[in-house]
């Protein structure tokens, strides 16, 4: 009996000692957040240099670094439609020093086209905030003379098969084409390995038209090499004000590609709040706004990190259904 009492007292003492240490253990993240940031931050992009994600990262990194008082270094980790870079961030130490700049494809679309995705994005990332929006552009090349609007394109599809190129399988341009196919089935998706070949073949008349993120098509449209029949944003974009929205022909047809910042899921909320504040300051800078506009991106932020987290989860569910219904699978 004495041994039992001694053992019980020892256990209680150990428990009391553990409870006494709890405030210290809990204070570590808070202290780290108080001192954040104290060293350079890596901003990972899941694509090679020169694409829309990379351009956005290099636009925002200097302003973000200035707001935080440390260097923000862009790091390209390309592959698997951005998933390789995203996975690297998801598995990084959640201390705010390794962040992901991502559009909708790497953490909404591409993982849902994989048989065994390496992460579940709504769970494995914590949103910081959105920084910009850009629509898809629906444009036609020289093969479709007389087609000036999306209504014209859909009418032409009643009489003949229409081929629309994109930068590859499973991206937002491809899924936009799948939504058009639901309206008019006589549309064929022609995937290419990248924006460059898709644009070249559309200009050369090998396909009828193209659906792509606006930035790679912007100059071709401005120089009238391609005819934009619609942008898929809710409202017309300022830098192509004469191009109608898809909703003007198809009410409710709204497809926007966002660009935003994310951290690993267990990053302290206090660190997320500091990053959100710094991002807001950077995006509000006139120079950043001008650079985004020149890249055919519209500065855009949500009310809070939590609001962007919900937008991410909602988009994941919405596009997951489109991917499943279309039977889209990543093949390379």
Describe the residue ranges of each PLM region:
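N-terminal (or domain-start) structured segment
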Residues: 31-124, 161-163, 169, 182-211, ...
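Bacterial N-terminal signal peptides
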Residues: 16-25
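Hinge/capping helix and adjacent helix->loop/strand transition within the periplasmic-binding protein
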Residues: 91-97, 112-197, 246, 251, ...
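A ligand-binding cleft/hinge motif common to bilobed small-molecule-binding domains
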Residues: 105-116, 178-183, 209-242, 320
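An extracytoplasmic/periplasmic, membrane-proximal ligand-sensing/linker region
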Residues: 38-40, 222, 269-332
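Beta->alpha turn/N-cap motifs
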Residues: 101-106, 166, 195, 212-217, ...
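N-terminal export leaders
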Residues: 7-17
